[in-house]
Amino acid sequence: MLFDNKNRGALNSLNTPDIASLSISSMSDYHVFDFPGKDLQREEVIDLLDQQGFIPDDLIEQEVDWFYNSLGIDDLFFSRESPQLISNIIHSLYASKLDFFAKSKFNGIQPRLFSIKNKIITNDNHAIFMESNTGVSISDSQQKNFKFASDAVGNDTLEHGKDTIKKNRIEMDDSCPPYELDSEIDDLFLDNKSQKNCRLVSFWAPESELKLTFVYESVYPNDDPAGVDISSQDLLKGDIESISDKTMYKVSSNENKKLYGLLLKLVKEREGPVIKTTRSVENKDEIRLLVAYKRFTTKRYYSALNSLFHYYKLKPSKFYLESFNVKDDDIIIFSVYLNENQQLEDVLLHDVEAALKQVEREASLLYAIPNNSFHEVYQRRQFSPKEAIYAHIGAIFINHFVNRLGSDYQNLLSQITIKRNDTTLLEIVENLKRKLRNETLTQQTIINIMSKHYTIISKLYKNFAQIHYYHNSTKDMEKTLSFQRLEKVEPFKNDQEFEAYLNKFIPNDSPDLLILKTLNIFNKSILKTNFFITRKVAISFRLDPSLVMTKFEYPETPYGIFFVVGNTFKGFHIRFRDIARGGIRIVCSRNQDIYDLNSKNVIDENYQLASTQQRKNKDIPEGGSKGVILLNPGLVEHDQTFVAFSQYVDAMIDILINDPLKENYVNLLPKEEILFFGPDEGTAGFVDWATNHARVRNCPWWKSFLTGKSPSLGGIPHDEYGMTSLGVRAYVNKIYETLNLTNSTVYKFQTGGPDGDLGSNEILLSSPNECYLAILDGSGVLCDPKGLDKDELCRLAHERKMISDFDTSKLSNNGFFVSVDAMDIMLPNGTIVANGTTFRNTFHTQIFKFVDHVDIFVPCGGRPNSITLNNLHYFVDEKTGKCKIPYIVEGANLFITQPAKNALEEHGCILFKDASANKGGVTSSSMEVLASLALNDNDFVHKFIGDVSGERSALYKSYVVEVQSRIQKNAELEFGQLWNLNQLNGTHISEISNQLSFTINKLNDDLVASQELWLNDLKLRNYLLLDKIIPKILIDVAGPQSVLENIPESYLKVLLSSYLSSTFVYQNGIDVNIGKFLEFIGGLKREAEASA
């Protein structure tokens, strides 16, 4: 159970060893492996090379000796490899040497000594990677091997090559890229979900830049794919055999096992990587970098870390990668050894340890974003790692927040008057807006412009760092290499200097100006960030919405915006009030084209969802908010979405609390803030984790952080109790009741299938008079013009299965199911479906090709803006001008754009929009929080949640019924007011819905701002709270006085104001007449007097 603290004290009291005392030396940490058969194997290799005849006889032994004795490869490698494989490696290396001399002679250039890039992958998931790099020196022993070459190409060429190599030894070429095969190791082994855990060892030849990497599939004592559970006590004692690769465990010292056990414990306790640097106890010239993290929580991290060594011109001697088969999470540990006496001279000037400390700091940054869009600028060392990540994030920000429309578009709209029924002009304007947004300043254009102006980006980065890098004194900063580099950059003193600089170097009609100015706006909008916190899983920013969202495009400025960038996603969170509630949705894209479309719309979608939520939340104390996480293309699996969600949440928490286990951050906000999340598309299964995680991170508001939790945590699952669907169904049923359709057959179309919350409950709650004609969901399209079997649909809904599991034997001759994976199939009416996904995505506009008519359409799923002015004509009868679907209840948020809603109603459709129909879930969430606030912890755990057996308490069951009743009541009240006002003045229902929400929210804000009722009429205040607002069953448990003491005063105020505002408007309409309001309050006062 969530409240069980029995294990926490024991773990905290464990005697945690010091990492510095456990790293002895590379020779001691890993035992020297004795391979008795090495000499015999060596002779077999010589024989094989001799038989093959590629290497001259008098050079074979020298080449073999060099490989066996000069590259620093330990005997463990030789014991595991066959003579055939070793001979192949030696052939590859020898061929590269020949290549050097041939190019020196014929091209007149001095190429790298070992210009080699080769990989060998065997059938047993074993691989060897060989790659050279610049900065190669040439040893005397190697020169003996090349005596033949001097005869062939001449001593002058050889001597010239040696001089060049010697020069490179002193100063590594800044333009040289890091090892390119490192990213292939990531892709083939570390990030490949079909690949089992592996063990990796890399060796750098002491006198060259030749890197040899050996990868082996890990072998565990207990090869359980689910991993092995292991206690913290065992980890700290180094008892890790059950989760370790057999070879690693065999060759590791006891100290090394304890060290790895400690790192594993630290990784299990918190999110993100554990990164440590220590000197070896026995070899003071040796420094060891250790990085531990959960596998699949980042991508291309191995290559990113190696590129960091390259950037700081550090040369490791050995790189070990160990994988551990831990329950729930495979954990990877990098163990990298560096010797000071093997480093380049210019590295020694600024201290190897200082460089490694900088690597330690930036390894956390690269864990969050291992691949950035400015890799080439970074490789040229024109950007530091931090500058490259800053530019990467800045480019994403610019792509989403740059004002592409400009003043010309705004001036155009000010010169024309668009009537709401002029769909042609509305469509032209919408198309122009979309074209301006989609076809100007692509992401790549932004990146190219920023790369060109890298010096300006560096100056803006310094402006950003000067504000947000938290430090006690400049003296502390001067110790880091990044500060020493930053000190050389002159920032912009103010906006005037920035503008003058741009005007001096960039033409005034260049798009570069807009890009760079938007990056400056990004800097100014940042109120807090975790960018400089070392242990982070993604990078988060709290932005000032007044600076990044123009009034022209976003008429109502939000209260706050969060912006999060991770290695597999970008995320946003928009809220319209300080205390606000809304779900977090995940948007997946199966391919790049879909991703590009989703990316273009994500900010508008997030804003519209949050705005809709603000209107939906008119009945509850909290304002509206919404979060959207957009995953990189192709990431659609459950575990991939969870990683993104968990990193999004953790990064947000970083800048919501002051975590004593992390560094401080600069907070430019005048007060602390709290966010309240809820489930939405793709995140319903993650809310329990987020609740527990907030508790683990000691968030004081963890109980109310997430709603829709499992009942064992005090949550009320929306899907299990149909909370959202109850509101939608109330509107459907009221339409039938009002228009006398209850006993008439109604033909129905639904998007969102029986596997989802809204779709399944809509099926289960459907009335007997409804006949389903078509349903579509993530698996495809199910349609039957003669009606779908209701019992079969209910079976799928109960089992939460997709329509792909529908028993097609129960379809008529004209019925069909088309999978999203289908291609080139013929339907019963002769229609050819070329692509199943395209057919599914457009079926809602094509349905009348397969059915004669539809009476009611209930969208319960689907992408926002699925019906727009651009496809409106599919829903309008050309002959009559009437809407082909007479009734629409928009259960899915934003399924229909507001202009399209107006147009549909103009053509006679009776349409109830999302902000009215889809508000049951937020009511449930709000009342879930109310229960946790009204009851003390003891009552909440033992009386509300109940025992640990899973049986829900009587109080819980009664409260659920209370919540369901309130949802239906609020929906029916709003329906009545919407219907009456529509009948009274003919205003479109969707417009009245907006006016209703605005009126309630405005009155609510005015009442919150006023202290009159709260301070001066305690009798009325307490009567309303205890008799009208807070459910009686909670008061019966806690007592009236305790309830009022348990709930924070600020929350009681908004409880009172939201009740008064919504109740008044539902009774009196959208005209807030002061006389009517006084009468309303007077009536409540008389009720309070009568009840006294």
UniProtKB/Swiss-Prot annotation:
Cysteine pairs bridged by disulfides in the record: none
One cellular-component annotation, GO: cytosol
Subunit-level organization: Homotetramer. Interacts with NNK1.
This protein's UniProt keywords: NAD, Oxidoreductase, Phosphoprotein
Active site: K626
Free-text description of this protein's post-translational modifications in UniProt: Phosphorylated by a complex containing the NNK1 kinase.
Alphabetical GO biological process terms: glutamate catabolic process
Catalytically driven reaction(s): L-glutamate + NAD(+) + H2O = 2-oxoglutarate + NH4(+) + NADH + H(+)
Gene name tied to this protein: GDH2
EC category: oxidoreductase
Phosphoprotein listed as a keyword: yes
Molecular functions per Gene Ontology: glutamate dehydrogenase (NAD+) activity
The keyword Phosphoprotein appears for this protein: yes
Name this protein carries in UniProt: NAD-specific glutamate dehydrogenase
Family: Belongs to the Glu/Leu/Phe/Val dehydrogenases family.
PROSITE patterns tied to this protein: GLFV_DEHYDROGENASE
Record-linked SMART domains: ELFV_dehydrog
Stored Gene3D superfamilies: NAD(P)-binding Rossmann-like Domain
Enzyme Commission code(s) on record: 1.4.1.2
Origin species: Saccharomyces cerevisiae (strain ATCC 204508 / S288c)
Matching Pfam families: ELFV_dehydrog, GDH2_N, GDH_2nd
Observed phenotype of the null mutant: Leads to rapamycin resistance when grown on glutamate as the sole nitrogen source.
Miscellaneous field: Present with 7400 molecules/cell in log phase SD medium.
Stated role: NAD(+)-dependent glutamate dehydrogenase which degrades glutamate to ammonia and alpha-ketoglutarate.
